[in-house]
């Protein structure tokens, strides 16, 4: 996976000091950002030129104390040909030697008004997301009450129809049929649609539906974190289903664990309403209210009361 410098410019606002068409096509292959403090002092033993080079106040201040050809010689080493882009934060002045070094190595040179730590965070977050390894899962990804919900189940069970009904009830579609899943950080899983299927739902017997055209921009979302999974399965009276909600299932995607609720489907059940209830119950548990525990406490109190009687 790689991100071009042009992709970075399309996403984050910078003032371009120097660029060329070839420099804009250079690839960023890591989300780690280099702040070349020791390098400006001449120590290059662990220098990693393939990273973005970010100059903050400290690096810039030291650079400005170096004068004459020494400054240019240092900058030529820091701004190596392998370096994809050099960024100067805080709208700090760009010395002519830095522009000359950028031209020498054909590197895009950018300036940002953002504080260095803030810019570092924005860059890392963007690159982590874009460079993350993606896997494809079959299902419907929705934003329901602000919760990212991945709806899965056997083919033909009604996942897309449930998603369409949820859109009609005011929730937002992220992806239908193919969901591209990626790990945004160590504990967060996110999902987005395949570009060709963005804003689309396929309903058997009807065909492809453009959700944004029919229901408006508020009915779709580009991506969402996956907070819970719901699995639709055909009702089987011989199979035991969780009736109290005290036996949660955990599924794993890309090494991230996600709580799963399994919902039996049969004629006459309003699946979209049940999905909404499952999501609201999930939110309530996150807020500290557990209806199952409340019921168990009441049952324990009732049994104790009957024994005393």
From Swiss-Prot:
Keywords: ATP-binding, Carbohydrate metabolism, Kinase, Magnesium, Metal-binding, Multifunctional enzyme, Nucleotide-binding, Serine/threonine-protein kinase, Transferase
A GO molecular-function descriptor: magnesium ion binding
Annotated binding of ATP, by residue: 153-160
Active-site residues (renumbered): 138, 159, 177 (proton acceptor), 243
ATP-binding in keyword set: yes
Catalysis: reaction(s): [HPr protein]-L-serine + ATP = [HPr protein]-O-phospho-L-serine + ADP + H(+); [HPr protein]-O-phospho-L-serine + phosphate + H(+) = [HPr protein]-L-serine + diphosphate
Region (Important for the catalytic mechanism of dephosphorylation): 264-269
GO biological process assignments: regulation of carbohydrate metabolic process
EC number: 2.7.11.-, 2.7.4.-
A Pfam match: Hpr_kinase_C
Annotated segments matching region Important for the catalytic mechanism of both phosphorylation and dephosphorylation: 201-210
Residues noted as binding Mg(2+) in the record, renumbered to the chain: 160, 202
Necessary cofactors: Mg(2+)
InterPro entries reported in the protein's UniProt record: HPr(Ser)_kin/Pase, Hpr_kin/Pase_C, Hpr_kin/Pase_Hpr_N, P-loop_NTPase, Ser_kin/Pase_Hpr-like_N_sf
EC class name: transferase
Domain notes: The Walker A ATP-binding motif also binds Pi and PPi.
UniProt similarity note: Belongs to the HPrK/P family.
Subunit description: Homohexamer.
Function summary: Catalyzes the ATP- as well as the pyrophosphate-dependent phosphorylation of a specific serine residue in HPr, a phosphocarrier protein of the phosphoenolpyruvate-dependent sugar phosphotransferase system (PTS). HprK/P also catalyzes the pyrophosphate-producing, inorganic phosphate-dependent dephosphorylation (phosphorolysis) of seryl-phosphorylated HPr (P-Ser-HPr).
Other facts: Both phosphorylation and phosphorolysis are carried out by the same active site and suggest a common mechanism for both reactions.
Annotated protein name in UniProt: HPr kinase/phosphorylase
UniProt gene name: hprK
